[in-house]
Regions:
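Active-site cleft segment of glycoside hydrolase catalytic domains centered on the general acid/base Glu
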Residues: 43-45, 70-121
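Short, low-complexity, polar/charged sequence segments that are solvent-exposed and flexible
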Residues: 30-35, 51-54, 82
């Protein structure tokens, strides 16, 4: 079976768009990781279209975050169900991606909701 537009021949990639032209110019399209802050409103049905990238042969991965510091990559436990619904809404309405990552480094304290960052020194 030939690879789909979501299955690159290469394992390398970049974090966030801006340098993908280097892979394309070399004839070696790889992965492109997007990071999205979605919040946890279960009624929000907004989405993104990643087909401008996937249609060029780039494989798109999207990390779904509740937010960034101090909101937390995932919300407080009381909002888990709302965040799950928001993620489901986003995935169902978005195009050009089939690899989804929920949250980022949840074992890293600064990624938790309400985390306080201590300055070193």
């Amino acid at each position: 079976m030939p690879p789909s537009r979501f299955d690159p021949d290469y394992i390398f990639g970049i974090h966030e768009p801006g340098g993908e032209h280097l892979m394309l110019e070399a004839g070696k399209p790889g992965w492109l990781l997007f990071s999205e802050a979605l919040g946890h409103n279960p009624n929000d049905r907004s989405s993104k279209d990643y087909t401008p990238f996937s249609d060029q042969g780039l494989a798109v991965m999207v990390r779904l975050n509740n937010g960034y510091h101090p909101q937390g990559t995932i919300p407080f436990a009381a909002d888990y169900a709302n965040f799950a619904r928001r993620c489901a809404n986003f995935v169902a309405s978005s195009q050009g991606c089939r690899v989804w990552i929920i949250g980022n480094e949840m074992n890293y304290a600064v990624e938790r909701p309400g985390a306080r960052v201590r300055n070193s020194g």
